[in-house]
């Protein structure tokens, strides 16, 4: 078993929303995203069989936040424990996703240089892939 001091762990969680409020507005303002969603629609119905019978708009509203191409990250919260046991927390949030992601990237780079490990619920299967893909989409390296 790996023994990592709690003072070397960065706890991380993200919150996402759909990039458009609904499919209709997505078709108007982001036709390329709407086209992508049309290609994904059958995948959504296979992945979430409970959504069979829902309209395309209902599926988009319910599931868009789960796929980086259709999502937007609105909040990233982190926490870590100091040597004296005190817990420090910080949240990055706002309408400007690119600015938020740049701030998070700066923090993650700093933590990597200090030898921190990341910890979070479903971090490997959701948070990290979502962060990475949204950073690529927003041109953040």
Predicted regions and their residues:
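Short glycine-rich loop/turn motifs
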Residues: 72-76
